[in-house]
Design a protein with these regions (language model features):
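Secondary-structure transition motif
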Residues: 1-125
């Protein structure tokens, strides 16, 4: 898998594709529209693709909010946040007051989850 990143531009209030990373200068080139911008790397706003896609074919990135139906209990639907992990993408309940457990996203079939937003969206359906 070729690493793919996106970046939340706080100044532009939008998500942008990362087209280059310069580790020597600690900066990114982002492309929110048709004009490229160079910004300093801020890991809080940098999100890597998991390489997975939801039931609608939407690519899943760290920081995405997914709505998931559990295969064992068709009645339970939860909202989860995709969490950074050096080994494989994990998901944790969006409401951490319920539990702080995390689960391996690869364990679930794409038919069970759908991207509904990301951690920077103000409103998640």
């Amino acid at each position: 898998m070729i690493p793919k990143f996106r970046y939340w531009s706080h100044a532009l209030q939008r998500m942008a594709e990362v087209i280059a990373i310069n580790f020597t200068k600690n900066e990114l080139t982002i492309m929110p529209e048709t004009i490229g911008y160079i910004v300093p790397i801020n890991e809080e706003y940098l999100m890597q693709s998991t390489g997975l896609f939801d039931k609608n074919g939407t690519e899943i990135f760290e920081g995405d909010i997914i709505k998931m139906r559990f295969p064992m209990d068709r009645r339970f639907i939860g909202r989860f946040k995709v969490i950074k992990d050096p080994v494989s993408p994990k998901i944790g309940l969006l409401d951490e007051s319920l539990t702080t457990e995390v689960y391996d996203l690869y364990n679930y079939m794409p038919d069970y989850y759908e991207v509904v937003g990301n951690v920077f969206d103000e409103v998640v359906e």
